[in-house]
């Protein structure tokens, strides 16, 4: 039985709901969902340029967990860019505290 997941502190939610290749209807493309904690990890590491330890403390998780989250997030974004998939983002109605 896996350990219960810790709640992750999410500092902001996106203004858009998805990103997709230009000129192709979204219903014709495969989708990859980016979770709220993955988006927050990208924001902390790549936008605010925090070190992993600082970002992990901000989210309320261990440095190793943060590393796993950011790795998953970057992989999803790269797949969407390289393979032309739709990247769906968490919507505004989701809780700021996310159980992942």
From Swiss-Prot:
Disulfide bonds: none annotated. It comes from the Bacteria. Pfam families: DUF134 (PF02001). Coiled coil: none annotated. HAMAP family: UPF0251. Belongs to the UPF0251 family. This is UPF0251 protein VVA1436. The lineage of its organism: Bacteria, Pseudomonadati, Pseudomonadota, Gammaproteobacteria, Vibrionales.
